[in-house]
């Protein structure tokens, strides 16, 4: 998985949604993907209050990369780390 890549996630009802990978980071030895809904260039649907989706990257028994949902506490920890990273990168300019 790479930053800028668009991936398709499938929910419990088999609905497909496209997400763009906007960042990858490691927190406490685990890797995470930060995703936002992928929007066509001619669409202006992203709203300011829309949250990023954070999923943990793991390997399945066959060595394939999979994405795993987070519990609320883990989500908060990673969201805080990502916010801090963005603030640090913003202050470097």
Curated annotation (Swiss-Prot):
Descriptive protein name: UPF0473 protein CHY_0543
InterPro entries: UPF0473
Family of this protein: Belongs to the UPF0473 family.
Biological classification of the source: Bacteria, Bacillati, Bacillota, Clostridia, Thermoanaerobacterales
Annotated Pfam families: DUF1292 (PF06949)
